[in-house]
Structures are given as C-alpha cells and as structure tokens.
A protein has these predicted regions:
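N-terminal maturation segment of proteins
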Residues: 24-589
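Bacterial N-terminal signal peptides
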Residues: 11-22
Length: 589
C-alpha cells in the first residue's frame, strides 16, 4: 500500500518558539535545539491545561474545564503550535528528531481535528463515557499523606460542574444532529445508575477512605471520612442522578437513528480523517473495505480446514453454533476464567526470552473488568500503569461467562498481556532516551497491529496445539479482518447494524453477545477498529521482507528489537526504520 506522512511545510528559515522570524539560515545543531525548545513549550502547555497533574488545593479546575471559551483558546494555541512545527525544515533535523517531529505534529493535529469536527459533542461511546472515566481518577493521588485525601476530595467536589459542561456539549450535539445512535444506547443508563448508591460506603469513590493509609490520628481520619460522605452525598451522586435523568429523558430519545457517522454533518470528511488517523496511511475507505473482504476469504479457508481436521460433520454455521453453545468451551465461575487466563500468561512468560532481547521491568497482573462497566465492555483489555509503584493489568471480562469462550483465551491473552500490549507499552515507557510525548504515546495502528501480530507469535511459541484453540486464533484474526468490512460498511456505505452483525456472525465464532457489543463499539468509535489488521499486515510484511533479504542473518529477537526500539510510531516510520535495519545488517556482512 502507499503510505502517507503528515503534511509538512519546508522552509530555510523557521519561526522561533515565540514566533519571531529568524533572519538567517540555521545550522543543523541550532535547528535541533530550536525544535527541542518548541517541543518543550508544547509539553509545558499540555501540563498547564491538564487538571489531573495539578496538586494545588487552591486550583480552580482540578477536573477539565470544558467551557466554550477555554476549548476555543486551547484550539487556537494548538493551531499556533502547528504553524511553528510546519515552519521547520524537517530535513535539517537529526534522524531521531525527524521522528519526534512526525509524532508530536500528529498529536497536535489530532486535537485540532477533533475540535474541528466537534468530537466534544459526543463525550461517550457504547463502552464508556466521561462519567465512567472518573473511576480512574483515584490513581493520581498519594493517599499516604493527608494532602492526597484533601486533593481527591477537592476533585470530587468539582464533579457537578464537570458533568454539567459535558451535558451542555451533548445538548449542542442534539441541536446539530451529532449524537451517538439510539441503537448503541440501549441499556447504557445502567453504567450511570451503577454509581448511584444509597450506601455511600459502597461507592468506589469512597474506597480510599476505607483504610487510614496516611496514618492520621482518629479525629483527623474520622473528619476526612465524614467529609468524603458529605461530598459524595451532596455533590457526586446528585451529579450522576442529574446525568441519568438527562440521558434517559432527553438525550437518548433525541439521538439519531442512522448508525453511520457519514450521515452526520461533515460526517464523510470526519470518517476519512479518522481512518487516516487510526491507520496512519492514506488508504481510502473503499480500499480498506476491499482489503477486508480479501482477508475474510483467506482466513475463512483456513477455518474450514480446521473443521475438517476435527471431523465435524456439518456446515460452518453449524460448527460455530456448536462452539457457541457447548458447555465444554466455557468457564463456570469467574475464578476459573481468571485462572485459565493467568496460566496462559505465565506459559507465555517462559517463551519470551526466545523472542526478545529485552523484557520490561514492570510486572503485570490479571484482573476482572470492573463490574460497573463490564456488561457493555469488550472481552478483555490491557490497563497500563499510571504510576511507578503500579503494575499493568490484563483485564478479563467475567460478566456473562456463557459468552466468554475458552477457545479464544490464548489469543486474547497473548494480545492483551504478553507479548502484546503489556510488553510493548511497558518497554515503551522504559525508553528513557525518548521524550515523554513519545514514551507516553499510543499510536493505534502500531499498538493494535503489534497486539494482533502477538497472537500470531503464539504459533511459534507452542500455543494453539488444540485445534479448537487454533480455530479461536483464526476467529480472532477473522474478527479483525471483518472490522475492516463492517466499520467501513456502516460508516461509509450505508450498512445497517443488523447487516454488520450478520456479517460478523456468519464469519466468526464470536459469541452473539460479543458480536453485539463489538458492533456497537465500531458504531460509536468510528475508524478505530481499522487499525488492528492494517498494522498487523504491515508488521508481517516487514518481517517477510527482512527474512527474505537477510536470509540466515535474520534473527527474530533482533527483528522484534527493531520493531519496538523506537516506541509507538506511524507505520510509514516503522517501515523506514526496518528498511534501514535491513540495509545496515547487509552492509556489515
């Protein structure tokens, strides 16, 4: 496929970070220095507008300020940064700074694009929303000190204002016809009502106040607990109640009936923008759709071979029905499912030295998806650490166990834990020579492409020996291939939700529950699902090129090192770096 770089404007003279025009040709060293100054300015600004990094109890905004004035000012500043970035002669930067420029520019551009397309009108997807994002807020506080509790309480006290600002933008979306579709909102109110509790002490927001980790005296500790109960009962829970009422009586009834984002104002342009953002290529939706159909046909043929291998007498649909309904393929308790996932992860741990030179220092755990979001959540997901004293976590959805087949658990675990997301993200965080905006970056085409490639690596690590598990691997690969078809189908080509679900049902062994939740995810998050297969196919193609050109000089551990050593990068940057590695290796022979 043809790859595209984010647009760059080349000039012999550049703007300084203060936008003063330079009057002379700059040396490479001074250009790198000036670029670094600019990126430092961008990073400083990001910190200034991020309320979660604030530790001052007197700060006015400890949760995001989403007023129209503030969002407009932030967008203006980002456009300013883009002008400064585009004024730099990228060819004059060091090779590493050229990558830095590409990545930070894409990050800033994405924020500008989201604002331009009014993404803030829809602060929710079928899986989560601003109301559930607060569950993670607890991580950013030091509860070994009284000040940590006080800061947390101050943040909680701002929940009503934060909710009202989001609701105001949702009302703007209702006026503009830019809402989530009604189809994906059925039952969504349960994720809101989960926070509305009569017993304050059962609230997850009260959890930090169950243990006196700051070792305060009894009077101080009891005073903090009383304050927490007051903030929750008078501010937080009423905010959730107000949102619940707005959602059920105003928002959902007014939500659009059409599921495709292309039916919304400027929707086709928005989808094309999201497709480019999530794949980091210039592939059109039409080309992506066709690629998906080709991959579906290829994978289907491999699945048919396994059906023959196990001696099943019946059609593909009958075999899938057998997998979906036979009790032998399902755990009977959450503990059993978690233990199976943990065992698979531990088996893969032992194979990692054969595949990688460097392993991350940060450990990971296996845990259930939080109950408040589990009903509409995907099968599993990786939740990265936010602080140095935390582990990463591979979340396994234990809700509706009869919809969580064991035959896909090897593929799921390798994707979310190791060698997939945990290994890649944890290693990325340890690349100390990279600036923070790259260590903390997550480019979906790279990260999800690596996750899907990691499922494939299980073949080389001795997994999928059971034919049903291998069928599970293929159904997960088919799942990602089908995404290319149904995501573009719904958002660009007028497919109905039922047609998309039928395509998924007919071509994968995913449970019907998963088919529904996944289809709704694609509807509510346009374009993101395209990244997996595009990224995986790129990594596989680069590996094949390296194996062919290097012959007996090919080293799988070195290849993986080259894939991961630059962190999360756009696919065209990855291709440039792998080609450089191949050429350098050949030159040394």
């Amino acid at each position: 496929m043809k790859n595209v770089r984010p647009s760059r404007l080349f000039s012999a003279c550049v703007f300084s970070v203060t936008l003063a025009l330079s009057g002379c040709q700059l040396t490479s060293h001074s250009l790198d220095s000036q670029f670094t100054q600019l990126t430092n300015q961008i990073e400083t600004y990001r910190g200034e507008i991020s309320p979660y990094s604030r530790k001052d109890l007197n700060a006015d905004y400890l949760l995001p300020n989403l007023s129209a004035t503030v969002l407009a000012e932030q967008n203006k500043q980002r456009v300013n940064f883009l002008a400064q970035l585009d004024s730099i002669d990228v060819s004059g930067l060091s090779s590493e700074n050229q990558i830095n420029h590409t990545i930070i520019r894409a990050q800033v551009q994405n924020k500008v694009d989201e604002y331009r397309f009014n993404a803030h009108y829809m602060p929710l997807t079928s899986e989560y929303g601003f109301h559930s994002s607060l569950s993670f807020m607890v991580r950013g506080h030091d509860f070994t000190k009284k000040a940590g509790f006080e800061l947390y309480l101050k943040r909680l006290s701002q929940v009503p204002r934060f909710f009202q600002q989001n609701i105001a933008w949702m009302k703007e979306g209702m006026k503009a016809g830019l809402t989530q579709p009604q189809a994906v909102l059925v039952g969504y109110e349960e994720s809101i009502s989960a926070y509305i509790l009569e017993n304050i002490e059962e609230s997850e927001f009260f959890a930090p106040f169950k243990a006196n980790t700051a070792k305060l005296n009894d009077a101080e500790w009891q005073a903090l607990q009383a304050q927490a109960k007051q903030v929750l009962s008078e501010s937080v829970i009423p905010a959730y109640q107000d949102y619940f009422t707005f959602f059920t009586t105003e928002y959902r009834p007014a939500a659009r009936e059409e599921i495709g984002i292309s039916t919304t104002p400027n929707g086709k342009a928005f989808y094309a923008n999201r497709a480019q953002h999530y794949t980091t290529t210039d592939m059109t939706p039409e080309a992506i759709h066709e690629l998906g159909l080709q991959e579906v046909a290829r994978i289907r043929a491999e699945m048919e071979q396994i059906i023959k291998q196990v001696g099943f007498e019946g059609s593909f649909a009958e075999f899938v029905h057998f997998l979906r309904t036979d009790p032998q393929f399902y755990a009977t308790t959450p503990e059993q499912l978690l233990k199976e996932a943990s065992f698979i992860a531990k088996k893969m741990d032992a194979q990692l030295p054969k595949l990688f030179h460097t392993l991350p220092r940060r450990p990971y755990g296996v845990a259930p998806v939080p109950a408040s979001i589990a009903p509409k959540y995907t099968t599993g997901r990786y939740s990265g650490a936010r602080k140095d004293d935390e582990a990463g976590f591979y979340w396994v959805n234990t809700y509706a166990l009869d919809k969580r087949p064991l035959y896909v658990l090897e593929a799921l675990t390798l994707h979310e834990a190791v060698p997939g997301h945990h290994l890649q993200i944890a290693l990325n965080a340890e690349l100390d020579y990279l600036p923070s905006y790259r260590r903390n970056a997550y480019i979906s085409a790279f990260g999800e492409g690596w996750g899907l490639y990691s499922e494939y690596l299980g073949l080389e690590a001795g997994f999928y020996q059971d034919p049903y598990s291998n069928f599970g691997r293929l159904t997960y690969e088919m799942w990602r291939a089908a995404r290319l078809v149904v995501d573009t189908g719904m958002h660009m080509f007028g497919w109905s939700r039922d047609r998309a679900m039928k395509f998924m049902q007919d071509n994968t062994a995913l449970s019907l529950h998963n088919v529904k939740t996944e289809t709704d995810r694609y509807i509510s998050w346009p374009g993101q699902a395209l990244s997996y297969k595009i990224g995986e196919l790129t990594i596989k193609r680069l590996r094949k090129e390296a194996e062919t050109r290097l012959g007996d000089k090919f080293d799988i551990r070195e290849f993986h090192h080259q894939i991961l050593r630059h962190g999360s990068v756009p696919l065209f940057v990855l291709e440039e770096q792998v080609n450089q590695y191949i050429n350098d290796t050949l030159a040394q022979s």
